[in-house]
Amino acid sequence: MITSSDVSTIRAQVRSWRSQGESVAFVPTMGNLHQGHITLVKEAKLRAKHVVVSIFVNPMQFGQHEDLDAYPRTLAADSQALIDAGAALLFTPTAQTIYPKGLQQQTFVEVPEIGDVFCGASRPGHFRGVATIVCKLFNIVQPDIALFGRKDFQQLLVIKHMVNDLSLGIDIIGIDTIREASGLAMSSRNGYLTPEQKHTAATIKRALDLIANAVRQGEAIDKATAEGEAMIVQAGFKLDYLSVCNADNLHPAQADDKQLVILVAAYLGTTRLIDNLCFSR
């Protein structure tokens, strides 16, 4: 695996592959890799000749009081995991490389409406940061396909909308959430949880299953959502949001919507966890 923090090196390597007619997949990450990330890389290997991975803790997507400085940096372990998973190229830019003029003078990308609700409302500017860095990385790497986990469902939709709106010509592929045996969605932020909190955190998935099963059986969405909310709050969470939505546009679910997604964000102690569950009725 080649590792570089230099944009021109990354571009030259991708051009070399393309000159030989070889396909390129891309998996952008913030590092501190877990099995969910490794699954993305392995899935990418099934779909393209070469896999490029980026590791960049993006300051633009962190709010003023969020955990940018505390976010774990584990480059040595991440590099070995990516070698084992079959990645061909690792891009590790610095903030100076990505934002040479600083965040305030940086051109940005903003995806309206779908980026303004849920996590977009709770974390103002977050999806501007996500869309901007992903767009910039896409322009550097210029992959055929890019893979993202469905755990960050709203993020996945934001990126799909951006790619479509800006005619970037990249196929965006969502990969199912990887979960621990308890049902807890794998996340880098799980590392902030105590063992007891990790046990409690599995309640989120149970609440999502409860809501989905109730709605499938004909229960009113408001009633099912209230039951799920009670389960989450009683377990000790501070709920940010819990909503059943149209899976295509994140509008509140209507009676004739068939493809639905339940979105949830909640705090356990100081750790904010998100999850979702897609289902049809």
UniProtKB/Swiss-Prot annotation:
Q: Show the coiled coil region(s).
A: none
- Give the enzyme's main class according to its UniProt record, as a single word: ligase
Q: Give the reactions, separated by semicolons, that this protein catalyses.
A: (R)-pantoate + beta-alanine + ATP = (R)-pantothenate + AMP + diphosphate + H(+)
In its UniProt record, which GO terms are filed under biological process? pantothenate biosynthetic process
Q: What is its EC number?
A: 6.3.2.1
Binding of beta-alanine, residues: 61
Q: Where in the cell is it found?
A: Cytoplasm
The active-site annotation reads: 37
Which GO MF term does the entry hold, naming one? pantoate-beta-alanine ligase activity
Where, by residue number, does (R)-pantoate bind?
61, 155
Domain of life assignment? Bacteria
Gene Ontology cellular-component terms for this entry are: cytosol
Pathway listed = Cofactor biosynthesis; (R)-pantothenate biosynthesis; (R)-pantothenate from (R)-pantoate and beta-alanine: step 1/1
CDD domains, per the entry = PanC
Q: Where does ATP bind?
A: 30-37, 149-152, 178, 186-189
What more is known? The reaction proceeds by a bi uni uni bi ping pong mechanism.
PANTHER family named in the record: CYTIDYLATE KINASE/PANTOATE-BETA-ALANINE LIGASE, PANTOATE--BETA-ALANINE LIGASE
Provide the assembly information. Answer: Homodimer.
The protein's job, in short, is: Catalyzes the condensation of pantoate with beta-alanine in an ATP-dependent reaction via a pantoyl-adenylate intermediate.
Q: Which family does it belong to?
A: Belongs to the pantothenate synthetase family.
What is the protein name stated in its UniProt record?
A: Pantothenate synthetase
Organism encoding this protein: Shewanella denitrificans (strain OS217 / ATCC BAA-1090 / DSM 15013)
